Amino acid sequence: MTPEEYCQQKAASSGSSFYYSFLFLPPNRRRAITALYAYCREVDDVVDECLDPQIAATKLVWWRTELDRLYAGKPEHPVTQALLPVLKEFALPQEQLLEIIDGMEMDLQQTRYLDFKALSLYCYRVASVVGLLAAEIFGYTDRATQKYAHDLGMAFQLTNIIRDVGEDARRGRVYLPIDELQRFNVPVADILNSRYSDNFKALMEFQIERAEQYYAQAMSQLPAADRKAQRPGLVMAAIYRAVLNEIKRDGCQVLSQRTSLTPIRKLWIAWRTWAKG
């Protein structure tokens, strides 16, 4: 299996909405974004799949060293081997790839966030940085597109947090800011024990509204000249906003279920959004 095939398999097997946003890209950009996505999946899987935090931390140290090897032109892992030509073509900075690992380390070090400012740093590292790297691969002419990519990454991660409240709680994680739980009078124990209430629904409606604000802010900052190049992000936004709408329609039942779209619906949204440009 070639490094490119490894990355393709990693992307396709994840079932992620990201995969659908890559489908219509020209081959060189599709290979590049698939390699970047595979890298994100690899370091994310370290945290999700390692039951021992010390082992996970050791593996993340290995990935830091592997990035040094990558930027020295001597990568060992199939994903970084696939990334090597990407670095040369799109000049992706090592600091940003390292920041993604910083975000994963936050998952090993804390399971709660005091306020939205603290959560925003996490979202920046695990999502906005990915958006900024992806924007480089898709291409842009106006630096304002970086602001769009940053806010779109925030919107995506906030959507993930909303969708996965119950799933994360079963792992002992609550990403919703503590001060907001207090404001809406929702005890952490209610989330950890999947106790649904009107207060919890109001809290989640607030979270959804904030995510929507980030989507709107991102779209308002995307320069018209770069809209065509940045269509993969628009595809992702359309899919993720459809998930948010489903969650709202179901009354924010995120403690007991994980809302997702069928592959055919994702494909339809992707095709429709791409065709609209």
Regions found by a protein language model. Name each.
Residues 1-157, 162, 166-277:
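Catalytic cores of Mg2+-dependent Asp-rich isoprenoid enzymes
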